[in-house]
Design a protein with these regions (language model features):
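Nucleotide-activated chemistry modules centered on ATP-dependent adenylation/adenylyltransferase
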Residues: 1-273
Length: 273
C-alpha cells in the first residue's frame, strides 16, 4: 500500500514534517496519534489529519481512571476526525495509579516517573504492537506521533522530533517517533484548535493550564490549587494517601493542603470529583 501526501503547505505549515517522515507515510505506514485529551494532542490531531489519509490514522489513549479529568475520553471521541478509530490502552494489571503508588509507598518524581512508564508508555506501546500485527496492510511500518513541544520545558526542548525507535523496531516492525508540533507555542496550539472550530477540554476554561493527571507531580502550585477546588473528592483521597504512605506528591515534601492552601474536603463532597 502506498499513498501520496497532498503538498498543501498552508494546511501543514504548523507541522514539523521532514522528508523522511513524509516518505515513510507515503509508503503506507500507520500513523498513531497518542492522545491524552489535552490541547497539544488535540492540535496535533487536527494538523496531522489534514494530510495523512484517514485509513492510515489511529488514535490511542491510556485511560487513567479516577485521576483522569472527567470527560476526557468523550472529548477525544468528539474531536477526532470522522473514521479515525480510537483504542484504549489499559494497564496490564488493571490497577489504578493510586493503587500503584500505595504499593510502592511513594509518589513518582521527576527522575522516577513510573506513572508515565506503567500507565501510559508501556500500555500504549503494547496496544500499538498488537494493532500493527493485526493489520498487515501497514507492512509493519508505524509512526508514533506525540504532542510534546519544545516550549514546555528544557528537557522537551532537547527531544529529537523525528527518530527511529530502535527498542520497538524488531520482529518485522519499523517504528519511528514523531513530534509534529515540537516547534509550536502555546498560543499557536489554541489557535489551531479554534480555527478548526473546536474547543479544548473543559478543564482549561475552568482554570487549568495543563491536562494530565488531575493532581500531577509536575503541576504548578496554581494548577494543584485549582484541581483541589474542582475535584474535592479526589483531593481528599490524595491527602489520605499521603498520610498512609508517609510520602508527599509535591517534591517540596509539603503535604497537599500546605501547597494549595485548600483544607481537606469534607466527606460530603462529591465523590465523583
Amino acid at each position: 500500500m502506498s499513498t501520496t501526501i497532498a503538498s498543501d503547505h498552508r494546511r501543514a505549515s504548523d507541522c514539523f514534517l521532514p522528508a523522511e517522515c513524509r516518505a515513510f507515510i507515503e509508503r503506507g505506514a500507520l500513523v498513531a496519534l497518542n492522545h491524552s485529551g489535552g490541547k497539544d494532542s488535540q492540535a496535533m490531531t487536527i494538523l496531522v489529519s489534514r494530510f495523512v489519509p484517514r485509513d492510515q490514522l489511529l488514535a490511542v489513549h491510556a485511560p487513567l481512571g479516577e485521576v483522569e479529568w472527567p470527560g476526557t475520553i468523550e472529548h477525544i471521541e468528539d474531536t477526532l476526525p470522522p473514521g479515525v478509530p480510537l483504542i484504549l490502552a489499559h494497564t496490564a494489571t488493571g490497577k489504578s495509579l493510586l493503587e500503584r503508588i500505595e504499593e510502592r509507598g511513594r509518589f513518582p518524581d521527576a527522575s522516577r516517573r513510573f506513572c508515565t512508564s506503567d500507565t501510559k508508555r508501556g500500555p500504549i506501546e503494547r496496544e500499538l504492537r498488537r494493532y500493527l500485527k493485526a493489520h498487515p496492510r501497514y507492512g509493519g511500518r508505524i509512526v508514533s506521533a506525540m504532542g510534546m513541544r519544545a516550549e514546555e520545558s528544557p528537557a522537551r526542548a532537547k527531544l529529537v522530533p523525528w527518530r527511529r525507535n530502535d527498542r520497538n523496531s524488531k520482529a518485522g516492525r519499523e517504528w519511528f517517533d514523531w513530534l509534529p508540533i515540537h516547534g509550536l507555542k502555546t498560543d499557536d496550539v489554541f489557535r489551531v484548535i479554534a480555527e478548526a472550530g473546536q474547543a479544548p477540554h473543559w478543564a482549561y476554561a475552568a482554570g487549568m493550564s495543563r491536562l494530565s493527571c488531575s493532581f500531577c507531580i509536575l503541576a504548578s502550585r496554581s494548577d494543584l490549587t485549582r484541581a483541589a477546588e474542582l475535584r474535592p473528592g479526589l483531593y481528599r483521597d490524595y491527602i489520605a494517601l499521603e498520610r498512609r504512605i508517609g510520602h508527599t506528591l509535591s517534591p517540596t515534601r509539603l503535604p497537599l493542603p500546605a501547597v494549595t492552601g485548600v483544607p481537606t474536603a469534607p466527606a460530603s463532597a462529591n465523590p465523583d470529583l
